[in-house]
């Protein structure tokens, strides 16, 4: 027996050992997420679509924020209005121009005694915050705490897939914003020529401390995330001269903000800016850093099954087996479903675009009408419209990562007026889209302007269509 071991060891070169270790590492990276979990029976039994509708005016009002300039303006205004506490959750936070605007506003709020808590996903948190003088300057302010959700570590490959994808801003437990925008100039303001267009909601509580109100639900959700052992403190251990210079720069930037965005620093009439709602509810995925039960997808599908017509916005479509089955069930129940997603030529996510090229016939086969939007900018919107009352807006992409791996949030808003506003935008976007007709030929909206892909991009997607096949459930 000893002789056999010796022969095996003799044939194990350094290269072979490294290859074995690499295979083991890749296995640890993907194996925990290979099998999709099921929705627990208790959750299925307790879920009632009718519970998301109200019988009359509720305690919360809503505003719809559909452009990047307004998105920055709202954030600056709300942060300025805070008197007790600010909570910010974001998937990506960059110290670019828009990011520094938000950091400067948060720092000034802390200077006037407001408690500030920020949580950032651990992938972008490690890459963007580590050693960054602007974030170090912010966290060194009294009353400011920053945590990183599940920081990426090469020594824990089984955790790398689980990401925090939530984006919301809570002010004094009385109002908040929630949607799909990250904290960077790609989504906020007019700093960059490249933009992603997104939608989000502002919610304002008219009756203080209604524990059933959505703001209470969002706050409880945040506290659960914040208390997780995997939410690690981000600290400034030593305030260097570089950090002190960044602090000075940010304080000066606050003066620039007040001069440049004067409207943000005036009194706003929230009642005039918002719409009456019957009910607002929070839908979420599990928060643990592991393979997740698809609670949010199940909730959306159950709500869609009760509708006659469904319009969905998603930046890209990456369906797993269970998601295909869910779409087929909608078709078999007579629910008319349409999706608005990016045309491959305008999409910002190469993984999603590539998978759509591979899977589009199968998606069309479920009976879903897919509108391929050719907008001026790439769409990052995640929304679902059910008939003429219910609108769902948030961070959930129609893909397997949002379904099984990431934390995700969607607000379910029973508000006919909001539904009407978003539907009008959807009709405009459909006019700038193309759709596959029953005759197998594309039909083009009047506003669709073709955009030819470069030869390099075509070659890139040709290669990617092969490479993504074994990886698609992790895209």
Located regions from the model:
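Charged, low-complexity intrinsically disordered terminal segments
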Residues: 2-144, 154-162, 171-475
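Lumenal/extracellular "mature" regions of secretory-pathway glycan-modifying transferases
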Residues: 147-149
